[in-house]
């Protein structure tokens, strides 16, 4: 059996830009990030052990995604769990968040994001 979860580096460094933009546009807005619960390998290992799995192997990979323009970042937002936040903000606020992200991306010279995935390989008991 294989179980895959997102790792600690979730669209770094743009995730922080996105969260800052959301906070600037809607202070106190709760951005739901369920992947953070088991993002680090120790938490993932503990969850597997709690589920009764043993003799498993954990592996972590990092993919680098190239961003050629701010539109590439927004496609990632809309194609990921961040879409929930963008939709909850409403169209006008989401557009302002999108603009802030694009401006920061260009100002900071961000041309790629990292995405870490963790894999648990186990044999069913």
Where are these regions (language model features)?
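Conserved class I S-adenosyl-L-methionine
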Residues: 1-27
